UniProtKB/Swiss-Prot annotation:
<keyword id="KW-0677">Repeat</keyword>
<dbReference type="InterPro" id="IPR011990">
    <property type="entry name" value="TPR-like_helical_dom_sf"/>
</dbReference>
<comment type="similarity">
    <text>Belongs to the PPR family. P subfamily.</text>
</comment>
<dbReference type="InterPro" id="IPR002885">
    <property type="entry name" value="Pentatricopeptide_rpt"/>
</dbReference>
<feature type="repeat" description="PPR 10">
    <location>
        <begin position="418"/>
        <end position="452"/>
    </location>
</feature>
<feature type="repeat" description="PPR 4">
    <location>
        <begin position="211"/>
        <end position="245"/>
    </location>
</feature>
<feature type="repeat" description="PPR 7">
    <location>
        <begin position="316"/>
        <end position="350"/>
    </location>
</feature>
<feature type="repeat" description="PPR 11">
    <location>
        <begin position="453"/>
        <end position="487"/>
    </location>
</feature>
<feature type="repeat" description="PPR 6">
    <location>
        <begin position="281"/>
        <end position="315"/>
    </location>
</feature>
<feature type="repeat" description="PPR 8">
    <location>
        <begin position="351"/>
        <end position="381"/>
    </location>
</feature>
<feature type="repeat" description="PPR 2">
    <location>
        <begin position="142"/>
        <end position="172"/>
    </location>
</feature>
<protein>
    <recommendedName>
        <fullName>Putative pentatricopeptide repeat-containing protein At1g16830</fullName>
    </recommendedName>
</protein>
<feature type="repeat" description="PPR 1">
    <location>
        <begin position="107"/>
        <end position="141"/>
    </location>
</feature>
<feature type="repeat" description="PPR 3">
    <location>
        <begin position="173"/>
        <end position="210"/>
    </location>
</feature>
<feature type="repeat" description="PPR 12">
    <location>
        <begin position="488"/>
        <end position="522"/>
    </location>
</feature>
<feature type="repeat" description="PPR 5">
    <location>
        <begin position="246"/>
        <end position="280"/>
    </location>
</feature>
<dbReference type="Pfam" id="PF01535">
    <property type="entry name" value="PPR"/>
</dbReference>
Length: 608
């Protein structure tokens, strides 16, 4: 055993003294003379090699051998290698330059492989750098490269950039369309359905059809947005392309009719389904129950539930979650708790929606003392999503010590804490009366260069504003602008609210004007917040300017804001004359019960 250990050490010493050419030059030729490359042997060589340029060059060398293509293991391993190289050489250009010096011939394949490594590793900034670097070497990206870059743009939410790449693909293949469809369906908005229609039409026009999985996504999007007529067209396409209509497709169509506010058509379709011999399953019944509950047709929902029980169908966790939610909405909190406690007997594992529903039930019933008891059964055996949910619920109901305890358990379990986790943590600290600790932790998180979004910055700033720490909040916001951290319209609106509350109305007005120069446009809430502050200070000229802007942009103000503007400007003859038609329309909307409380007080950024 001792001899073996010594030999391993000696072998490593010998290998380390060999030149690059002996390992990656002569060795491959001798090796291939004996037998061809295999995935297992290449992966073994890569895994045993250091993360340096020689290993990367060897990876490229293998890729250009006849009839050899790297498998997923090799690509996944190379993610760590290129990450180390980018830290060492800082840029892709320098890595390419060093590869040339080491004798690697720079061809389009090198860029394509590098792009795929960064793409697989979700290192999107470097993937973009590789893609743009192709042109400097005179290489034109092929369809595969453009497909990957389109996917990157979608994942970075640069939809216009993704579509521009899609349009620029000269020879689109199945994956070009599939990537675009997948992302549009995942985004899930009604506007994304337009994108799906455009891509699907082009796809069929070029002789391609979606697979079963993608058809399911498209159908789900149509039904989720209540576009049932489009959903039936998708079903027609599925049948034409040879894909059978399953019971799950029927269930989605039933759900779609409910979402479009047509319960009778949903029931008719359900009956039609039975007539043609397609037996409904638990998913179908759950769609019916949820549809009735959402429309307030509770009696009908419980009739369907009784049918489920009479047919002996065992409820799954989705149906149990729905029943907990339904009982909570009806104020039948004891029955909601009974469903929750029955899960163990049914051998069902609670998920994030289960805990969200039961915690909501306990909070609404005022049984706050039961919250720790319900969650005690979870112990420390929960995943990142459930941990985020628990800490958020605890934070919202004022149990900040419990929230921080859950977060400490998550940290101890070495979870890959995400932006949402950090947001909940900082908000819990602020609500728990520890704003200084929150600010200190905020700076530490930023220093570690985590992937943080605009919501993270907005939440800490808003939490400080709610504590009355206006100047501190504004200072953090200005630092975000200076450091070019991601900010959105909510971030600016929160900062404007802080300035309004701090009576720094001139700065609030300037910030409202400046945000448009940065490409971020105010929304209804932004206008409501700034107008409320301006009306309090009787800044008539600025209110006039903002009102003109709202009219020009077609922004519909809420009744309270309209009342404040009308009360301020209608007393001036010139203003009344300029906005007469607008004011006349507003007057018909006013009631005696219009609440003229501070509009900016209603703005709060939830971490949920």
């Amino acid at each position: 055993m001792l001899w073996r250990c010594n030999w391993v050490k000696q072998r490593k010493r010998i290998l380390n003294t060999l030149s690059f050419s002996s390992i990656h030059g002569q060795y491959p030729r001798e090796y291939t003379a004996a037998k061809p490359l295999t995935h297992d042997n290449v992966y073994s060589c890569l895994r045993e090699s250091p993360a340096d340029l020689k290993t990367l060059n060897f990876f490229f060398w293998c890729a250009k051998q006849n009839n050899y293509f790297h498998d997923d293991r090799a690509f996944d391993h190379m993610v760590g290698v290129v990450e180390k190289l980018t830290r060492e050489y800082y840029s892709i250009d320098r890595i390419i330059e060093r590869l040339k010096i080491s004798g690697c011939e720079i061809k389009p394949r090198v860029f394509l492989l590098l792009l795929e490594i960064f793409w697989r590793g979700h290192i999107y900034d470097k993937a973009i750098e590789v893609y743009t670097g192709m042109s400097s070497f005179g290489f034109v990206p092929n369809t595969r490269a453009m497909n990957m870059m389109m996917d990157v743009n979608f994942k970075l939410n640069v939809v216009n950039g993704a579509l521009e790449i899609f349009e620029g693909i000269r020879f689109r293949n199945f994956f070009s369309f599939d990537i675009a469809l997948s992302h549009f369906c995942s985004r899930g908005g009604r506007g994304d359905l337009v994108g799906v229609k455009i891509v699907l039409k082009r796809m069929i026009g070029e002789g391609f059809y979606p697979n079963r999985e993608r058809f399911g996504q498209i159908l789900r999007l149509c039904c989720r947005t209540g576009c049932v007529s489009e959903a039936f067209q998708v079903v027609g396409l599925m049948i034409c392309s040879g894909i059978s209509v399953s019971v799950n497709v029927w269930s989605m169509l039933v759900s779609g009719f409910f979402r479009s506010g047509e319960p009778q058509k949903a029931v008719d379709l359900f009956n039609k389904m039975i007539q043609i011999g397609c037996s409904p399953n638990l998913v179908t019944y759950t769609s019916l129950i949820k549809g009735f509950v959402d429309l307030g047709m509770v009696d009908e929902a419980f009739t369907v539930l009784s049918k489920v029980q009479s047919e002996g169908l065992a409820p799954d966790i989705v149906l149990c979650n729905l029943m907990i939610h339904t009982y909570t909405r009806l104020g039948r909190f004891e029955e909601a708790r009974k469903v929750f406690t029955s899960l163990e007997k049914r051998k069902l594992v609670p998920d994030q929606y289960t805990f969200a529903s039961i915690l909501s039930s306990l909070c609404l019933s005022g049984k706050f003392d039961l919250v720790p008891r319900i969650t005690h059964g979870i112990g420390t055996d929960f995943d990142l999503v459930t941990g985020n949910l628990l800490s958020n619920c605890f934070s919202k109901i004022g149990y900040n010590s419990y929230a921080l305890k859950v977060l400490s358990i998550m940290s101890y379990k070495d979870f890959a804490l995400d932006c949402y986790t950090y947001t909940v943590y900082l908000s819990a600290l602020c609500r728990g009366g520890a704003p200084r600790a929150a600010i200190k932790m905020y700076k530490i998180i930023i220093k570690e260069k985590k992937h943080l979004d605009a919501h993270f910055h907005s939440a800490i700033i808003d939490s400080l504003i709610e504590l009355g720490k206006y100047n501190t909040a504004v200072h953090l916001f200005k630092r975000c602008i200076l450091e070019k951290y991601p900010l959105d319209v909510v971030s600016y609106t929160v900062a404007i609210k802080g300035l309004v509350r701090a009576k720094r109305i001139e700065e609030a007005y300037s910030l409202c004007c400046d945000m448009k120069e940065g490409g971020i446009y105010p929304n209804r809430r932004t206008y409501r917040t700034i107008i409320s502050g301006l009306c309090k200070e009787k800044e008539t000229e600025k209110v006039r300017k903002i009102l003109r802007e709202c009219i020009q942009e077609g922004v519909e103000l809420d009744p309270n804001t309209k009342f404040q503007v009308y009360s301020l400007l209608s007393r001036y003859r010139g203003d009344f004359s300029e906005f007469r038609s607008v004011f006349e329309k507003w007057k018909s909307e006013f009631t005696e019960n219009v609440d003229v409380s501070d509009s900016d007080d209603e703005l709060f950024v939830s971490v949920g």
